[in-house]
UniProtKB/Swiss-Prot annotation:
Note: In S.obliquus the gene for this protein is split in two.
GO biological process: DNA-templated transcription
This protein's name: DNA-directed RNA polymerase subunit beta C-terminal section
InterPro entries on file: DNA-dir_RNA_pol_su2, DNA-dir_RNAP_su2_dom, DNA-dir_RNAP_su2_hyb_sf, RNA_pol_bsu_CS, RNA_pol_Rpb2_7, RNA_pol_RPB2_OB-fold
Primary location recorded for the protein, binned into one broad class: plastid
Family affiliation: Belongs to the RNA polymerase beta chain family.
GO MF term (any one): DNA binding
Recorded GO CC terms: chloroplast; DNA-directed RNA polymerase complex; mitochondrion
Length: 565
């Protein structure tokens, strides 16, 4: 072998025949050696070779260098896809590099759902105007265009988890199965053999997600019923349907299913213990994986939510508000070039809060739209002068006017404002309006998660008042200041209902329904909170006496709280 050669021209003697090593010979199954130009090091073959001591010494160091390259660690990053965040939003990561790209420390490898090019990107740049519009943006309300809904500008994906768990009852254990009584087969087509919804299924309101049955007490069945079940070839299963179903008003897709098993079935076998102690095989047990049954199932549903009336939006300057109305595109105010606006904000939300930066943002955004430029303004730029922001913004608007020949972009008489037109009548508005492009965000406070109604629900054990909170199916709290407001209006009977039969008057709310049906006067009892207060004062060793008027008009003392009406 030539020491400085870069070609594979080495000849070896194998079975008394000479052959030339090619690429196939090197990487084949017969010959295994490590290559380092210009050295060859043999590791697992038995070829008779004659290598000089100098070449052997050089090959040793070359082999060590190759092994050091082979032992290098490779960093592996697993990207998340369609995962759920703590706010029930979507977590998805998309790679920004391809195989073979050279990267170094600090380079961007992947983007998430809320970033673009490694920068935070949570909202959209849209056309806005600061003007009142028929009272629909009163008190920080927001008027938006139908374009934001149809083009999915603010459509978000939310993932919610629903869980079902089997419990042990007095009559037996609950089971997760697809054999649900009194459910037709067409309503179970989307379930697998275990009774769990298939991955990727689109589900709607009331559809079964996880089939579960609960044992019930066996009822006496007459001979006619038994004959009927025999004719229909149905079994008398003492089970009731307790399946997990899709919540009301939800249309979503199943994106993930987690099955948790806590109980295992055991069975003895001869292979469990070694031969010297086979006599104890009756006490040995082995896990049978095929007989595992799910005890807890978590189903993750992904839902698309378009922006709607009641959703909360905000800008980058704390200018938040609630969507009050969605107007058709043709009814929105439009610019002199015919561009319809996307959003109308209330101008009264600017001076009182002193966040004038939103005005500079929307005007500079308008200039950047027509100049096709991108501006990055650092905070506290007034260090360059008292009017640095205003001067820079007006200069860019004037530059956009000169380059595009759109004179309405900058008017020296009222800089930063322009004449726009009513979309419903086509007539221009009386006064010029501030119009621009601002960065607006959709917040996680959605109306679907806020809206709630209650008729009759759970009550607290101590105070006997309705529970609070939407998750507990609670009621609306009537606090101290709300009571003052009702008192100020003089609504005495509404206040009486709120504090008694709608709250913690046990006897009153039990007789309310029957009294209404029988056209009888509504009975008002004593609130339970008053009784709790008396008991707490008596626990402090205070003698609290309760008196009531008898039929003769005299006061008589009530000996016990249970005697209160």
């Amino acid at each position: 072998m030539k020491k400085k050669s870069f070609c594979l021209n080495f000849r070896a003697n194998k079975k008394k025949k000479n052959f030339v090593l090619s690429k196939k010979n090197i990487f084949g199954k017969t010959q295994k050696f490590k290559i380092c130009v210009p050295f060859f090091t043999y590791t697992e073959n038995k070829i008779n070779t004659h290598i000089s001591p100098f070449d052997s010494f050089s090959c040793l160091f070359a082999s060590q260098s190759i092994e050091s390259l082979q032992n290098q660690k490779f960093s592996k990053y697993s990207l998340q896809k369609y995962q759920r965040s703590n706010q029930d939003t979507l977590i998805v990561q998309r790679p920004m590099v391809r195989e073979g790209d050279w990267v170094q420390s600090g380079d961007l490898l992947a983007d998430c759902a809320s970033s673009l090019g490694g920068e935070l990107c949570l909202g959209k740049n849209i056309f806005i105007a600061y003007m009142p519009w028929e009272g629909y943006n009163y008190e920080d309300a927001i008027l938006i265009s139908q374009r934001l809904v149809t083009e999915d500008v603010y459509t978000s994906v939310h993932i919610e988890s629903y869980e079902v768990e089997t419990k042990n009852t007095k009559l037996g254990k609950e089971q997760i199965t697809n054999k649900i009584p009194d459910i037709p087969e067409k309503e179970k087509n989307h379930l697998d053999e275990r009774g769990i919804v298939k991955l990727g299924t689109f589900v709607h309101e009331g559809q079964i997600l996880v089939g579960k049955v609960t044992p019930i007490q066996k009822k006496y069945r007459s001979g006619y019923e038994k004959l009927l079940y025999t004719i229909l070839e149905k079994e008398l299963i003492p089970m009731r349907d307790s399946s997990l179903r899709t919540p009301k008003g939800l249309k979503a897709k199943v994106v993930e299913i987690k099955i948790l098993n806590f109980s295992w079935n055991f069975a003895p076998t001869e292979k469990t213990l070694p031969s010297p102690i086979q006599q104890k095989k009756k006490n040995s047990k082995i896990l049978l994986k095929k007989q595992r049954k799910p005890e807890r199932v978590q189903v993750y549903l992904a839902e698309k939510r378009k922006i709607q009336v009641g959703d909360k939006m905000a800008g980058r300057h704390g200018n938040k508000g609630i969507v009050s109305k969605i107007l058709p595109i043709q009814d929105m105010p439009f610019l002199p070039d015919g561009t319809p606006l996307d959003m109308v904000l209330n101008p009264l939300g600017v001076p009182s809060r002193m966040n004038v930066g939103q005005i500079y943002e929307c005007l500079l955004g308008l200039a950047s739209k027509y100049l096709n430029h991108y501006y990055r303004i650092q905070a506290f730029d007034e260090i360059y002068g008292p009017h640095a922001s205003r001067s820079f913004t007006f200069a860019k608007l004037y530059e956009a006017r000169l380059k595009t020949n759109q004179k309405w972009l900058f008017n020296p008489c009222y800089p930063g404002k322009m004449q726009i037109f009513d979309g419903q009548t086509g007539e221009p508005y009386d006064s010029p309006v501030t119009v621009g492009i601002a960065y607006m965000l959709k917040l996680v406070h959605l109306v679907d998660d806020k809206i709630h109604a209650r008729s009759t629900g759970p009550y607290s054990l101590v105070t006997q008042q309705p529970l609070r909170g939407r998750s507990k199916y609670g009621g609306q709290r009537l606090g101290e200041m709300e009571v003052w407001a009702i008192e100020a209006y003089g609504a005495a009977f509404i206040l009486l209902e709120m504090l008694t039969i709608k709250s913690d008057d046990i006897s009153g709310r039990m007789t309310l329904w029957s009294n209404i049906l029988l056209n009888m006067p509504i009975y008002i009892g004593t609130p339970e909170s008053f009784k709790v207060l008396i008991c707490e004062l008596q626990a402090l060793c205070l003698d609290m006496g309760l008196f009531q008027l008898n039929k003769k008009g005299f006061l008589t003392q009530i000996e016990h709280l249970m005697q209160l009406p």
